[in-house]
A protein has these predicted regions:
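Acidic donor-binding loop of glycosyltransferase active sites
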Residues: 172-190, 200-203
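Short hydrophobic beta-strand element within catalytic cores of glycosyltransferases
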Residues: 204-207, 223-224
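C-terminal amphipathic helix plus adjacent low-complexity
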Residues: 129, 238-328
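Conserved catalytic-core segment of nucleotide-activated headgroup transferases in glycan assembly
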Residues: 61-169
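Short alpha-helical segment that forms part of, or immediately flanks, the ligand-binding pocket
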Residues: 171, 196-204, 211-215
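Nucleotide-sugar-dependent
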Residues: 95, 185-192, 214-215, 238-242, ...
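Membrane-proximal helix-turn-helix segments that form the acceptor-binding/catalytic region
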Residues: 1-16
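Donor nucleotide-sugar binding/catalytic pocket of nucleotide-sugar-dependent glycosyltransferases
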Residues: 15-66
């Protein structure tokens, strides 16, 4: 659900544009009731009354299809097969934050700790919390170490990539030959931009079967992770993520099984995921977004007063000749 203040603000708009069908469903489906304190009867209802339209976040296909920079640091990784996670590590206990970052690490370690050390894949964590400071980096590192500590020497490799990367650097990360698949246990996305960008690699994506990313991740080309809708935990709640809300929690056993299958049968999953690239190039590019935006503006601009240009008189035209008057 969305906060009531958000509803009040939205109703001051003429048109509300959101990035996904999921976001639209949440916005139009949220309502607050005002009841008579004595009778308990509903006397008023607050919900969005203005039109809500969906406009996806188009991907720059020129940058994310053809990276012009190389992240040479990744060449040094000991593991040739690596899962990639991209997202903020926000507030919340392990298993309760919005991106479910801690459980991505724990599930990965649980699955691959049984393989011989030279056969284990790695996990690249492109993550941070509030910023990109040294303090933030060390805090993230401590969180990762805390999750891996119980696994001891059996823990597979987890790499932290911390810092602000440009679009070209992110594209280089996605396309690097040592990045084999992307994984996300997200509890809820308005859109899921890193997932959209990664589709242009044509590599496998494992992602929660819920929320905004479903718009551009066709089931036939994606490894969708099962789960269920659960309550927001107190440790993750704030003024935007309300305690009264619900979101998605991945079935970790299902996720573990599918992560292993992608690793163990990679070539078949690579064939399956090739359609992700075609789908984004055809339906979710910046150019396609522009087309949809123009259609939307044409639809809602009808009846809106148009600017009328002010036309100055042509001063170069022949001046009118006035008659000459005789002096008296």
């Amino acid at each position: 659900i969305i906060p009531k203040d958000f509803i009040d603000g939205s109703n001051k708009m003429d048109l509300i544009i959101v990035p996904s069908q999921f976001t639209k469903s949440i916005m139009v489906g949220t309502a607050y009731q005002e009841k008579n304190k004595e009778t308990g009867q509903v006397v008023n209802e607050f919900k969005i009354t203005k039109p809500v339209e969906v406009l996806f976040e188009g991907v720059n296909t020129e940058i994310y299809s053809n990276p012009t920079e190389t992240l040479s640091e990744l060449d040094k990784l000991e593991t040739d097969f690596n899962f990639l996670f991209v997202g903020h590590w926000l507030k919340g206990d392990v298993g309760q934050d919005r991106k479910d970052v801690g459980m991505v690490i724990r599930t990965f370690a649980t699955v691959f700790k049984y393989l011989p050390k030279d056969k284990r894949p790695g996990l690249i964590m492109k993550t941070s919390s509030a910023g990109f400071s040294v303090m933030d980096r060390e805090a993230i590192r401590e969180k990762i170490d805390g999750i891996l500590q119980p696994f001891g020497d059996d823990a597979p490799a987890v790499y932290l990539l911390h810092g602000d990367l440009s679009d070209n650097e992110m594209a280089s990360l996605y396309h690097h030959p040592k990045v084999s698949a992307m994984v996300s246990f997200t509890k809820g996305e308005g859109y899921g931009r890193p997932l959209a960008e990664f589709t242009l690699t044509g590599k496998p994506i494992l992602a929660s079967n819920w929320s905004g990313q479903i718009d551009f991740l066709p089931a036939e080309h994606t490894v969708l992770l099962d789960g269920q809708v659960t309550d927001v935990h107190d440790s993750a709640a704030d003024k935007f993520i309300l305690k009264e809300s619900k979101w998605f929690t991945v079935n970790y056993s299902d996720a573990a099984n599918k992560m292993y299958k992608v690793y163990n049968d990679y070539q078949n999953h690579l064939k399956q995921s090739a359609g992700l690239r075609t789908n984004t190039l055809t339906n979710f590019s910046l150019e396609k977004m522009d087309e949809e935006f123009v259609k939307m503006m044409d639809k809602y601009s009808k009846g809106v007063p148009q600017t009328v240009p002010f036309k100055m008189p042509d001063l170069n035209k022949q001046k009118m000749q006035l008659p000459k008057l005789n002096k008296v």
